[in-house]
Amino acid sequence: MARKPQVRATTPARRESILKAALDCFIGQGVEATTIDDIVRASGSSIGSLYHHFGNKEGVAAGLFIDGITRLNADLLRKLKRCKTAQSSVRTVVTQYSDWVTAHRDIARYLLNSRDIAFPPETKDQLREIHRSHIVEVFRWFGPYVRDGAMKALPIDTYVPIISGPIQDYTRYWLAGQVKESPAKVKGVFADAAWNAVRG
């Protein structure tokens, strides 16, 4: 009788399990203090599998950041493209960010607190391209609203800080335990402020 093949995690599933374990370790003890062995134990993977997917701990940290920011951007664009007006679009940028952070606290905390991680040059280049591509998509969406006067014509680099900056700051304070009210309770305040700042 032929032996049944052993069920093993597929490559995407293994990669995902390593990233999830790494996130737990990074949040629990910090990126610097986390070792490769910590991630291997937490994920149940082999060290060979980790090196195959990511190369080293810095590669895991970079992969986790890229994965998180890509999901955040994709979720925003998906919601944004359901909007019918300038007002609903601006408000969605704010409320979707708030909702995403609330639903994905650990990865949001990692994204917001990863500024000091020494990503390799190729990761920095990839992140710049991800950011550029995302901003192009967002501005392509809002461009017609600016042209038809529904939104103010402002210097292009000011829209993101005006619309997204305040809610990003608030969620950072909330994740750090510096403010009490959850973003869900105050997102409407920030959405109103963003719309009032850019409405035509």
Where do the protein language model's features map onto the residues?
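Short helix-capping/turn signature of helix-turn-helix
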Residues: 54, 113-119
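Amphipathic alpha-helical packing segments from all-alpha helical-bundle domains
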Residues: 70-73, 77, 121-148, 157-161, ...
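Hydrophobic/aromatic-rich alpha-helical bundle segments in the mid-to-C-terminal region
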Residues: 106-113, 124, 146-193
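Hydrophobic alpha-helical connector segments
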Residues: 63, 77-103, 159-163, 187
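N-terminal intrinsically disordered/low-complexity leader segments
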Residues: 1-13
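Helix-turn-helix
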Residues: 13-17, 25-59, 63
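Generic hydrophobic, amphipathic alpha-helix propensity
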Residues: 14-22, 39, 64-68, 72, ...
